[in-house]
Amino acid sequence: MNPVLTIVLGITLLTVVGIAFGGTFLLRVGNGTVPANDLQKTFFRAGHAHAGVLVTLGLLVAVLTHVAGASPGWGTAGAVAVLLAAIFVPAGFFLSVLGPDPQRPGPMIASVWIGAATLVAGLVISGVSVLAAGLAAV
């Protein structure tokens, strides 16, 4: 596995601690300890869920491209793009509803769309590189 990707994956595994801590934040929002309106509650849940799912997907993509024998450069690029989406998407959900009582998402919602584009790019790169590795092995 590409050493840079190995370092990125190690850092990613450590960030799961932060995602778990985010779960305790959601518990405090849910029981009313942290005040939040309905929009904030919905967006906080969406941000937390996307963080967990996209980190898991990014780790899976990294392992899958490596095991399939995909080009190390392309495999790394695809996996890192998926992991970047795991930053952009949740950040957009959380940061777009900051404030005492937002009624609609703020400008940081653009980060969700940037993350979605990054996710699609990473999945296409990874999918094509895994497919190419498979075809080369036939």
Across the structure, where does each feature detected by a protein language model lie?
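Polytopic transmembrane helical bundles with strong interfacial aromatic enrichment
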Residues: M1-V138
